[in-house]
Amino acid sequence: MQSMWEQQRNNNLTAKNAHMAVVACERYQAAENGHKFDRTLLPFDESCYTPLQLELFATNPVDFEFIEQKLENLPRQRQREYFRKLYLKAYRSVKDDGSIAFLLGNKQRRHANDYLRDILDVRLQKVFSQYNVNVDFLQAFINTPQWLLSVKDEMQQAVQFSTVPTREELAKHYNELHYSGFHFRLLGTQQKQKQLPFYLITESKLKKMAYEMATAFIRFQCDCSHFLKNGIEKDNEGDIQGYFYQLYKWCGEIAFSAGFKIPHWEKIENDKRIKAEHIDSTLIRLTCEKWWFKQMRDIQKRMVEHIAIACGEVRANAASYISNQSFQEWQLQQRKNHDYLRAMIIENIDNPEEQVELFDMFLKSSSNPALRRNEMMVRLRGLEEWAEENNNEALFLTLTAPSSFHAGNGNKKWLGVNPRETQNYLNKVWQQFRALLSKRNIKFYGMRVAEPHKDGTPHWHALAYVPAEHKEEVIRLFKQKALELDGNEKGAAEHRCKVEKCDKTKGSATAYIAKYIAKNIDGFALAGEVSDEDPTLSLHDNALRVRAWASRWGIRQFQFYGGASICVWRELRRLISGQADDEIINKAQAAAGIANDYAAYMEIQGGALAKRADQPIKLDYETKPANKYGEQRKAIIGLANRFSLKQVISRTKKWQIKKRPQDFAQRTESMVERSSTANNSARSAPWTCVSNCNRSILEQKIKLLTQPICAPLSAQKLDYLFKYKRLTIDKYTALELTENDVQLVKRNQNMMTSLSPVSRNFQKLKDFHKNQRIQ
């Protein structure tokens, strides 16, 4: 016999099913009558809805509110519209089997609802589980948090009723406060995001939260300091360090409960020691609202992009590598960056009249994608030449993550990981692979490129030079590590790791990776070609989207391993021939600055496999004042010979960034006129043949003249040209400056002997490289 509650339940279910059947029949009849439906049943006025919403209501009015509730937490209108379209597609994909369920629409509704739940409740939940940002906890900081008042009251009472606490009392209070940190974390896990998800909070709200967080940490650190200072023995360094270490842990627990990891927190989790200077800088960062805002904004942007990946917005035929919204945000930020560079100048501190546009300096630096590509190609060519001389062979390796790391095409194996986590996995595999080679005393060098699949998942291409006798062992170990995780899945051996032995008859080893460099920076020399990942994209557009993808996820696209220091190479190119008193530095300067020969430079530094400590030329630094976080800074001032201890200054001027004056162009023109008048007078000529303003005009002309044949000249080389009126560009060309004009001239043969002192063996090495290039 059924109980009363069971009978009531059955009656309710019967009434509900009858009501749903009536509504379904009305919907079916409306569809038969030309898809007409009663729009007065909509919760709001018809003008408040998009065409897809109206179509959705006409198709399935029974579940309309259920569907909209599922979609309301998606961060973008584009995503909500996308899922409405998918829902309608899933609804209409059900075939008519002649059943009553299909006639009433129940079968279609069930299939479409299950599809929507699978996407929004399963895939998105995998994303949300990785972000523990607690909005309720953050919003508590807008007013003084109750837990902070409680801790403050307890500390004041403890100070009021005790004069000098004993070590036992201090230990007790340490434990209480330490427990309070775990209490904060417990609060963070218990409270749920109720009203407004973190990824929907506006930027102005984030700034307010950042300010309140910084203010709360200032109060908390001050309260802890007042309480614990009585327990620190005077001049006892051990007690002081222990106090700051404990304060660091308390602050870390509070930040972790809010969903943020403070710097170096992984060392606490792994029970490792932290340097005192790292603790100090972290405690200062926690009191900086700008630091908090940057942390919140970065997490929010990556979370929104992660949701876009889970929703299928980043895929083929939609948006390759990065969502369209994030790509537009990146383009807008690039324009803002360029506008800032154009709005600023750099000024010589010692000579304020010498001013240069900051944007021009950007174009001359390695931040310029074109120059960065040129520099990488020079390095790769040098590595290849050095490998040929030392009988090393080239391997082209491709490393891809398992299928569970890929979100594309509704992959049910997807673990919910984002591109940054996949990059960390690839890094770990590569580190373990290098460790295996190191144990076998196998050394290798080369370069790797990280690029995305269509769904944003990164994969690697690597060019590796290895000794010929170890080539097969390197291939075996690489495949072993690449297939260590889920190596038995279908297609793993074919798609997840590829090894190609570079064939010189098909092209140089550098050519194997040159295309991947160009298509991930600026698409240079690839006009008319399309992307391998997305044939609808030109390689120029492909490069822009890849750069935006790398910026959003903080992924390093290019990395060399082995070889000599690139920073030393750049400083050598700033020097003038014969400027150094050290013979080795002068030889390296001739290789880097005149011959542009990276292989010869590596030979001087000890070869591609030399350790940094064994390379004779190193950077020379000067200590600068600490930054606002109390961290000591170092600035490059030149080069030094590690063994002879001789130094050379490559940066003779100190600059400061200033806002560009509104009359900068007019002042430039007037200074040109004054310079012209001064040059026609009987006064003695200054050390430079042009004024600062006229110099900027000549620099633009020099830039146009040298652009087809070399990289932009450094400031030191320009100074040399303006002082001595002649500068060697390469073995065949020089620049001459005459009467406020500059031109390219052919070098005289008798000048070839006036180069910086180069040993006979080094000259033979350079001639050998030249002959190899001609061949």
Curated annotation (Swiss-Prot):
GO terms for biological process: DNA replication; viral DNA genome replication. InterPro entries: Replication_gene_A-like. It comes from the Viruses. One of its GO terms (molecular function) is endonuclease activity. The active site is at 512 (o-(5'-phospho-dna)-tyrosine intermediate), 516 (o-(5'-phospho-dna)-tyrosine intermediate). The keyword Ribosomal protein does not apply. This is Replication protein. Possible endonuclease which induces a single-strand cut and initiates DNA replication. The lineage of its organism: Viruses, Duplodnaviria, Heunggongvirae, Uroviricota, Caudoviricetes. The keyword Nuclease applies. Keywords: DNA replication, Endonuclease, Hydrolase, Nuclease, Viral DNA replication. Its EC number is 3.1.-.-. Belongs to the phage GPA family. It comes from Haemophilus phage HP1 (strain HP1c1) (Bacteriophage HP1). Pfam families: Phage_GPA.
